[in-house]
Design a protein with these regions (language model features):
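Metal-dependent phosphoester-hydrolase catalytic domains
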Residues: 2-13, 18-28, 32-33, 37, ...
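N-terminal, active-site-proximal structural segment of metallo-dependent hydrolase catalytic domains
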Residues: 2-45, 49-136, 149-155
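Structured beta-strand-rich core segments of catalytic domains in phosphoester-bond hydrolases
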Residues: 66-77, 119, 123-218
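Residues that flank catalytic or metal-binding motifs in active/ligand-binding sites
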Residues: 81, 154-156, 193-197, 217-222, ...
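Active-site-proximal beta-strand elements of phosphoester/diester hydrolases
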Residues: 82-95, 170-174, 216-227
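Active-site beta-strand/loop signature of hydrolases that rely on acidic residues for catalysis
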Residues: 84-90, 108-133, 160, 199, ...
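Acidic/histidine-rich helix-loop elements
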Residues: 87-104, 177-190, 227
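Solvent-exposed loop/turn segments at secondary-structure junctions
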Residues: 90-93, 125-129, 148-151, 165-166, ...
Length: 347
């Protein structure tokens, strides 16, 4: 979902964001405090602590807290060391109460620490908010991203990862428009800038188990946030994402995370993303799964068997051992207006 879709105001897009700067980077792992050249602003840590104030309106909603164990705990033990993936629309940081970032941040911290995902595709995060999350996750996490209006401006499609398990090999950003490498571009009728970030990861743990270095386990993760209002823009965005995925090394599996702003199985965008046999919905393909809820709740009571607009898609060669929609809250306070979606995958 997008901010305007829930009746809230989104941060104003920065002016002059349509420059023609294009950024590509490859090679070595990135420094934790590296500042990406050009448009990118990535890996940063450190943030002020805040005091949580529980949201009375959320408590009144009567939404049940997630069961008293991490979602990944339900995944069966496997010898292949499954990768824990999460997609999470963070709800951009604001001071508006209830559900301000100051109220939500402590719950977000607890959720992420207990789940300990290896990689997280996030949506809507603002630069300072992402720095808060990086600090809360701890020094063994890093992240890649850039603001959709360029640099640190506006919302990010940032990708966090556990650097003890994963090492980035290369990454890039592109904008969902006819000019995908023009920063801040939007040409399909949408008023909000939309973009995608992808990263090629190496599984460090797997590589360490194969000391001959002849076998490396790598994969691509692409993270995005489609438009909340314009169906044409969503459909064109889906086609562009498929084109970009097809340009990547065909030998490596793909994982796609995002807020697609349409319900799974109910929209041509879903058909476009999963058609042709190149991507499958991890929720449908999972060996086991949690109860289903609408992944956007807007701080209202949860909807059992509701629409899934936040997805984790994978190459067919990837096995999803367990998929879950995480309803974790503390005293009625949710960390976001979306529920995180999680998958334990292996290949």
């Amino acid at each position: 979902m997008d901010d305007r879709a829930s009746g809230m105001t989104e941060p104003e897009d920065a002016a002059g964001a349509g420059g023609q700067l294009r950024e590509r980077a490859a090679g070595a792992a990135f420094s934790r405090r590296a500042v990406l050249r050009g448009a990118a602003a990535t890996a940063a840590v450190g943030a002020a602590s805040v005091t949580a104030v529980a949201s009375a309106s959320a408590r009144e909603a009567g939404s049940a807290a997630y069961e008293d164990r991490p979602a990944y705990a339900a995944a069966p033990h496997d010898e292949n060391r499954s990768l824990r993936v999460m997609t999470f629309n963070l709800r951009y940081a604001s001071d508006t109460r209830p559900n301000s970032w100051a109220e939500r941040r402590p719950v977000m911290r607890k959720l992420l620490r207990r789940e300990a995902p290896h990689v997280i595709g996030t949506q809507e995060g603002l630069y300072g908010q992402l720095r808060d999350i990086a600090a809360d996750l701890g020094p063994h996490y890093d992240w890649v991203g850039t603001g959709r209006a360029g640099g640190s401006k506006d919302e990010f499609a940032a990708v966090f990862y556990d650097a003890r398990r994963l090492a980035p090999v290369e990454y890039d950003h592109f904008w969902l428009s006819d000019t995908p490498y023009a920063i801040g571009s939007r040409t399909w009728g949408n008023t909000v800038i939309r973009m995608a970030t992808w990263v090629r990861f190496r599984d460090i743990e797997y590589s360490q188990d194969h000391q001959d270095h002849q076998t490396q386990r790598e994969f691509f993760l692409l993270n995005t946030h489609l438009d909340h209002a314009v169906q044409y823009a969503r459909e064109r965005s889906a086609e562009l994402i498929k084109e970009r995925l097809a340009e990547l090394d065909p030998a490596l599996p793909r994982v796609v995370t995002g807020d697609f702003n349409v319900a799974a199985h109910k929209n041509p965008v879903y058909d476009a993303m999963t058609g042709g046999g190149r991507l499958v919905d991890s929720w449908d393909a999972a060996d086991g799964r949690s109860a289903q809820y609408a992944t956007f709740h807007g701080y209202r009571p949860l909807v059992p068997d509701g629409d899934r607009i936040d997805w984790i898609l994978t190459s067919p060669s990837v096995r999803t051992r367990y998929a879950s929609i995480n309803t974790y809250s503390v005293d009625g306070q949710f960390p976001s207006d979306h529920l995180p979606v999680q998958a334990s995958i292996a290949w």
